[in-house]
Amino acid sequence: MDSKIQPTLRPGSSCPRPEWPEQERAEQLARGAALKWASGIFYRPEQLTRLGQYRSREIQRNYSLEARIKSVVQSYLEGVQTGVWQLTRALEAVQGTREALSQAHHLLKGLSRTSQTLEPLRECVVQHKQLQILTRLLPRLQAVPATVAHTQTLIDSERLLEAYVSLRELEQLKEETLAPLGGLELPIFQGLGLLAEALGQAVEAAAGAAGRLAREDPALLVAAIRVAEVETERTILGQAPRDWRQRCLRALQEGLERVHFASPVLPEPGALAGWLEALQVALPAELATAEALVAPCCPPSYRVVELWAHTLHSGLRRSVQQLLAGPELGAADTFALLHWALHVYTGKEMMGNLELGPEADVSQLEPLLTSENIEQLEAAFVAQVQVSVAQWLKKALDGEVAEWSGEQEPPTDPSGFYHSPMPAIVLQILAENIQVTNLISDSLHRRAHNMAVSELGAFLRSFSDALIRFSRDHLRGDAVAPHYVPYLLSAFNHQSALRSSVSVLLPDGEASGVLAPVEAALDDVQRRICRLVLEVLQVELQPLFSALPSRRWLLSSELLDGVCEQTSHFCQDFWRVRKPGVQLLLAEAERTVVLQYLRALMQGRLVCRGTDERSQAAERLRQDAAQLKELFLGLGLEESAHCAPVLLALRELLNLHDPTLLGLEVAGLRQQFPDVSEDHVSALLDLRGDVSREHRQAALSSLQAGPPPSPSTGRRALFSLVPTPTPSLSSCLPSGPCS
């Protein structure tokens, strides 16, 4: 073999072309190195002597490499030879195994045919064993139908523990037959499932009547609970576990709800309060029964009091929600439900009773009424109360208005003031509806306050409209009121009484600005009544003032005496008006008289023909001012409220002897009465009868050029309410309104 693996190439011989690129590259590198070395030798002749040594060294190295290659190839060949030998041995072993398996296969086929012939015998053996077991259990199996019937009888007679023991024995006998029979159930055991269900229903029924049984037959309740607990912890072969504990708890809840909330709560209008009162008594009694009687019959894990409280709460909440989903409740029912749910139910009388203990706490559960429910109920309650209040106020107003056209004077109180129960009725209606909402919540209280303010404002507007209709019908003659003015004065007292008591409508802690609409409505009613009263006075005085000013007026006080007499007679009933209303009426009456006086002066009926007449006119103005002052002081008007002194200011204008000083006097008049106009001044100058065009122009110019009136005067308008006749062309000035 060594001769076969000897290399056929010698050093320096040409090599065949390599088959791999790596080999070719290595050969190129080797040739390059050899050429490099040879070129170095040739360039250095002294090295040529060593060429023989190099050749012998290279030959030795080649021989060494060839020897190493031979050794490696030899080891590879020996390994291959060993592997071939092992493969041969393995092939022989596989062939032997194959032959053994073939023989075993033939043997198994024979055994299968043999086992098939023995199968009937095996079945006979199994049947023999089953018959042997059934023979041993035959007496017990024969008693199964009778035991089933007896167990059913025990269930029907509510002997639950005995029935459960009998059922357990039957189920145990069934388990003993299942394994030997290979899981086959005998027909006689097919009724056990129905029997167990009947017992479960009996347990459930007993739990559902726990409250009654705890009082009448606690032994039955205890038996039912014990059966449920034992059965829950037992496992039955081939069946799902019977969770009778959950059935029992569910029955406890359903029975409790059935007692108190079986039918939907749809009480008749007004009957809701009775239903709530019945629950107020029944629910605490039910919790007391649960704590004293039911809880000792149940395991502690049942937490009977907590279960009772939560069940009653959920049932009650569901009933309340059903009630709210039905027809809209009336105001009384809405109030009863809100008060009961927010205060009574959670109060000490019911669920907040300290004797119930923490297990009965329902504060962490969903409330009976959500915030949305409360909002809707409060809004509905206020809307219904508002309708009712509006109706009652309308009835009160209609009753009052019906008396205005009567033959009798308005009634008076012991002090002699005109009096009517209407203001007290109005405020009582509003105050009672506000006060009752304090029992519910602050939000409802605020709603009621706002409703009351709104309704009082509407009532005052209706009251004002009724006064207008009353006055219109009287003045037109459609329905003449015998006591027109007294009833107007009585109405004045009504608004005064309402104004003095309207503060009861102001919520606690609220600013008085909340009542601003009501106060504005009261002011409007007051102004309207004053206007209606003074219109009558104005009509009565108008014929008297038609003769003023005149020569007769200059010479005698007879005209003003008639005015004072008529005014005094008209104001004689003012004392029946309560203060400060009487002062307001007297002040307005005096103002009306003064305005009528000024209107008469401005009509140009009189022109003084000399100094004597001007002096007489000035003196008459002084006397008239004093007479009017005396009249109204006698009637009770405070002096600070008088406006008759305007006549004294006009007197100074008439009493002035030097016409050149009229400008100063007119400027002073404007300082006192900023609303005086050129027409008014011209009418007064016409009354003097001695003012030339130049003096008139100077006086009117001073009216425009004078200093602005002092803002501290605080006087009400007088002259702006006094009309003046259209001046003639001869009296028009370029600076006047006719220019």
Curated annotation (Swiss-Prot):
It comes from the Eukaryota. It is found in: Cytoplasmic vesicle, Secretory vesicle. GO terms for cellular component: exocyst; secretory granule; transport vesicle. One of its GO terms (biological process) is exocytosis. The lineage of its organism: Eukaryota, Metazoa, Chordata, Craniata, Vertebrata. InterPro entries: EXOC3/Sec6, EXOC3/Sec6_C. The keyword 4Fe-4S does not apply. As part of the exocyst, may play a role in regulated exocytosis of insulin granules. This is Exocyst complex component 3-like protein. Ubiquitously expressed. Belongs to the SEC6 family. Residues 1-21, 698-718 are annotated as: Disordered. Residues 1-370 are annotated as: Mediates interaction with EXOC2, EXOC4 and EXOC5. Interacts with EXOC2, EXOC4 and EXOC5; may be part of the exocyst.
